[in-house]
Amino acid sequence: MYLGEDCGAVYVRENGELRCVSAVKTVDPPPQNRLFTRDFTFQLCIDTLPSASRAERRDHFIFTYNKQGSLRYSVKTLFDISLQFIADHVEHVDSLVGFPEQMADKLFSAAEERGKFAELRTASRALQLFCEAYGELVLKSLCLRNRYLLISERLEEIRQFQSLECLDLYGCRLGDNHELFKYITSEALSSLVKLFMGANCLSDAGLQRLTAPVRVMKKGLENLQLLDLSENHITEKGLRYLTCFKTLQKLDLSGTKVMMDVSLKGFFRMMGMALSETPLMDFTHTACKTEGWAEQVINQWEITAAEVPKKDPKPRTNALRFYGREKFVREMLNSWSETSDATNKDKAVPIHFCKVDDCVQSSPSGETHSTHKSRKRRLSTEEEQSAAPVAKRLPLSVEDLHLLNSY
């Protein structure tokens, strides 16, 4: 039988059955009743998982060595596994209010190990979560002395700290219009007792802005007891804004433009304060330090801020050498440094004010000082009496003459 290309399918009847001659004979595979294929194994399922999830699964085990040196592993407790999961997703937690403090301390440490407070994406929310629930336990005292770069980089995170009792911002160059003023004068820092604002380029306008919420709305810094305003451009006019601090007990005005005159004495008499004869130890910054759960977080921020690469000053020095001004600039810088050192050496006498009760209840050193003064007075009077001329002394009596003749 001849089959052409133009012809279609040809069917032939054989043994009473009709079949197609031109079509390719295909055999359908028999149906399989298996649930899994022959090459399916549990190991293949593990290999298909992402590497990150496998690394997290290893955290659920504790690997140890026994005395024989063989490796053994044990499964962590359900509490530890749950704590790790919450720490990995702490930024998605709604609230920790009512959560036990002991568990919160462990959760804070676990989140710190995972870098939740160092990442800019999660640091602000994570700190806010803990500060709203535990307040001063997270951070009670914050020392940012001369850390102006840290303030500019971590301003949003610093704003989350509530219930601070001591804040040291000495030498941070804030000026009169810094964004941190809103945080200092907010209700979040109504519990602040000590505030160090020395060497911040503050003027009377900055002091007015700092005290505005207390003077107008009676909010913010209402419990302030110690204030450091040393080395700022503050005059007698700016001191009138301090009358709103009813609980103020100690004030430092060293290195300012305040002149002691009769009007200033009247102002401090109205404040119930007097000039301290000896420098107060509260303004030495020795007792101020960072305290709380977030102490290591602040240190880690400072370390990461210090790791930022510095700009190469080589193009600048090359330009100075090309124009022949390197020597001139160096001389100017040296002269400025010498003048600054001279000003630091020739600092004014510490001007510390305190409440009259505190001044009256002086330390034992003050008592010894007063006794020393009284002794000096006695010695001076005796010396004056001995140095007096003979003519001004009383004449000898008859009994005195007889007594002298008996010798």
UniProtKB/Swiss-Prot annotation:
Segments annotated as LRR repeats: 138-159, 163-184, 191-211, 223-243, 247-268
Pfam family, one: LRR_6
Disordered: annotated segments: 360-389
Family: Belongs to the LRRC42 family.
Keywords: Leucine-rich repeat, Repeat
Protein name (record): Leucine-rich repeat-containing protein 42
The keyword DNA-binding appears for this protein: no
Gene symbol of the encoding locus: lrrc42
UniProt-listed SUPFAM superfamilies: RNI-like
Domain of life: Eukaryota
Gene3D superfamilies: Ribonuclease Inhibitor
